[in-house]
Curated annotation (Swiss-Prot):
<dbReference type="InterPro" id="IPR050460">
    <property type="entry name" value="Distal-less_Homeobox_TF"/>
</dbReference>
<dbReference type="InterPro" id="IPR017970">
    <property type="entry name" value="Homeobox_CS"/>
</dbReference>
<feature type="DNA-binding region" description="Homeobox">
    <location>
        <begin position="123"/>
        <end position="182"/>
    </location>
</feature>
<keyword id="KW-0238">DNA-binding</keyword>
<dbReference type="InterPro" id="IPR000047">
    <property type="entry name" value="HTH_motif"/>
</dbReference>
<dbReference type="GO" id="GO:0000978">
    <property type="term" value="F:RNA polymerase II cis-regulatory region sequence-specific DNA binding"/>
</dbReference>
<dbReference type="GO" id="GO:0009888">
    <property type="term" value="P:tissue development"/>
</dbReference>
<feature type="region of interest" description="Disordered">
    <location>
        <begin position="182"/>
        <end position="202"/>
    </location>
</feature>
<dbReference type="GO" id="GO:0000981">
    <property type="term" value="F:DNA-binding transcription factor activity, RNA polymerase II-specific"/>
</dbReference>
<dbReference type="InterPro" id="IPR009057">
    <property type="entry name" value="Homeodomain-like_sf"/>
</dbReference>
<dbReference type="GO" id="GO:0006357">
    <property type="term" value="P:regulation of transcription by RNA polymerase II"/>
</dbReference>
<dbReference type="GO" id="GO:0005634">
    <property type="term" value="C:nucleus"/>
</dbReference>
<dbReference type="GO" id="GO:0048598">
    <property type="term" value="P:embryonic morphogenesis"/>
</dbReference>
<keyword id="KW-0217">Developmental protein</keyword>
<dbReference type="GO" id="GO:0048706">
    <property type="term" value="P:embryonic skeletal system development"/>
</dbReference>
<keyword id="KW-0539">Nucleus</keyword>
<dbReference type="InterPro" id="IPR001356">
    <property type="entry name" value="HD"/>
</dbReference>
Amino acid sequence: MTMTSLSESLEASDPSKSAFLEFSHGYQSHQQHSPGVSHAHYPVHGLHQGAHSQYDAAFSPGAASYSRPLAYHYSTAHHHPGAYLPYQHNSAVGYSRVEDADSEKQSSIESGEIRLNGKGKKIRKPRTIYSSLQLQALNQRFQQTQYLALPERADLAAKLGLTQTQVKIWFQNKRSKYKKIMKHGSSGPEGEHLQAASASGAPCSPGMPPLWDVSMPSKGAPIHSGGYMNSFGHWYSGHHQDPMARTQMM
């Protein structure tokens, strides 16, 4: 047996070497087919590159000039007018409420009382200051009658330069003051004035009972201060003289 035949038999009998040769042959065949596969990817890459170029061209600074609009469209020229209607309606309602509040405030002032924003504590108007001539005429008319009819009140207000409301309020206050004096009695100038008015006996005025008939019952006997001093004067004088006599004796 020669050396060449021995080497061929060893190569044929070695399974690992034959497997290595088959693997290397398969790898070479795979490399031969792989360039085609790699070239098949180039068109896809070019397609993506073209899409990116179109996207970049759409948003490039040159494309974003004033002559050409952007990719998204937004128009500010067309607006629905109804979007501003609620605000205008609310403003009109608020103005009407202000007018209503002013009218209510005016009505409350005319009635003789002022309120703070229509709520809270009442604030009365300042009292009317009457002149001496007006007071004299009102007192004379009150001596004649305590109640005025509507024509009489209008005539008296026109003569004195007052309003009918002022005349009516003055007569109301005068009647309430007169009733209070009649109930509790009076010794002041107002009571004397009313007594003189009742004594005059005006035909239109109702009969007024005299105020001086009211008598207050006496409570207990009157106490004289002199009696107190007299009862203790003798004891005080004797007690005062006794120490003086003792000092003289010493």
